[in-house]
Structures are given as structure tokens and as C-alpha cells.
């Protein structure tokens, strides 16, 4: 029987099987022997030991398509990144850092700008101009007014989505709306675990209940703590340009091969930024991250 690990705690792994619910499982010793640790999000083959009590063993961890470190989770299909249009105003450098992280992992990103009900039209237009031109899908929502929530639900269907964003942007309110009447906390897990005993924050998949009219193919959200800073240090500065998709049309047009689009003269990317074809906020954030990576190498 195949399922997905939705939570792991105290040596137990809770596996959601779409057709029959959540099973409390232990991992066989062979995984420890091979140095493999099951992760939340892993697709696994389980052996059911007790159907009534929903207990079993994990027999096999299926091949992972990707893996994140923070949060520790595997097999992410997409990321829903939530920022507010206003109150607080978006921290563009922080947003662009997260986009770079997802580009590096080849995880598609959907941008959700919340609190659009209290935002100026000029601010909404600015966000749209910056990020739609980079090729990212952009939604302007209001958790308070329920704007565009149904559209966001549709893009979550059948996917495992990491939900991320800084504190204070209405992420929790958005989750409450996305869950419709109930978002199962991994089925009966909340009854099996005494949460008071576990104060450490663990990665966890929230299982979205599907509309009865829609075939349930497994929709999950990975909620993450609000972040206030992100460091780009998992790659070299020469790779950074490949994580800004809007640079793509200008790669190869620079005078010098291997141009990093920072110091070199006759650079097509710099020229595009000067002409407004690449937004100055995005280009400036690229330069800031490039210099940060340059300093990392120096030390």
C-alpha cells in the first residue's frame, strides 16, 4: 500500500493513504543501516500490521524528486509564497532570495500578495509589473474579504505545496480559508499525539480535504514558520544569474562570454535594466546577492 509521510515524531511516521486514512508506522531498521532517514513528504510503501488500529511499517521509500532542508520535506510540487501588498510593505530583497532558493531547487513558485483590499492600486500594479514580467503566476488576495481564495484553491489541488512568507502578512488567515470547513491535521494524528509533550517545531503536511465532487488525488500544504531573513550560500556567485528567469533572453548577448552582469562593460542584462526591460528592484537585488556570495568566497 502506498502513501505519503505527513508527520514524523518520536520515531513514528504518520502515513496518509488517500483511500483509507492515516497509519502510524515505524521505519524498518534497514533504513538506519543504509543511512536513509524518512522525511515528511516521502512517498512510501507500507505494510499494514493492524487495519483497525491503523498501524504499520514503512517497507520502502520511493525515489524523491527533490528535498528541502528548511523545512525538512521531500517531493514538493510547488511553493506558494505569501507577502502582503501593504502593512507590512513587502521586503523585495527577502522575496527575491526565496525565489532564488526555489529556482535553484527547480520548484515552481506561485506568488500570493495578500491584504489587497487595503492596498493602493499603484502598489498592486507595481507588484504585478515586477513579478509577472519574470514569468511568475501572481494572485492578489484578501483573506479578510475572501478575494481570489477559490482561484488559489484550484492551483493547490492534487499538489504538495510549501507555503511560505514572513510574519504578519496574513498567512494563517489564508490557511484557514484554504481549508474550507476543515483542514485535517493529518487525519487522526492530533488525537494520537499529545501536542503538549512536543514543543519543537516539526515539518508537517496538512492534508487538504477535497470537495466531494472532485476526485481526491491528495492535496497537501507544508506550513512553514514566518521567515525574516534568508541567506543564499548553497551555490557559487557564477550560478546566481541562472536563478533570475528574466535574464534568460539576454544571456549570450553580452560582449564577454561568462558575463556575470555586474562589473563587465557592454552587458546586455545591465542595458536591459537601464532601459526598464528588467525591473531595477530585481536587478539591484541580484547585485546585492552576487556581492554577498563574493564575500562568502573571500572568507
PLM regions with names:
Residues 117-169:
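Canonical P-loop GTPase G-domain recognition
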Residues 13-17, 25, 46:
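SH3/SH3-like beta-barrel fold
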Residues 86-135:
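Phosphate-binding glycine-rich loops and their immediate beta-loop-alpha structural context
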Residues 11, 29, 35-52, 62-78, ...:
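Helix-rich effector regions associated with P-loop NTPase G domains
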Residues 167, 172, 177:
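Walker A/P-loop
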Residues 51-61, 89-91:
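Short, Lys/Arg- and Gly-enriched loop/turn segments at beta-strand edges
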Residues 1-9:
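Structural detector for short beta-strands of small beta-barrel domains
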Residues 21-30:
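Short, structured beta-strand/loop micro-motifs enriched in basic residues and often containing a Trp
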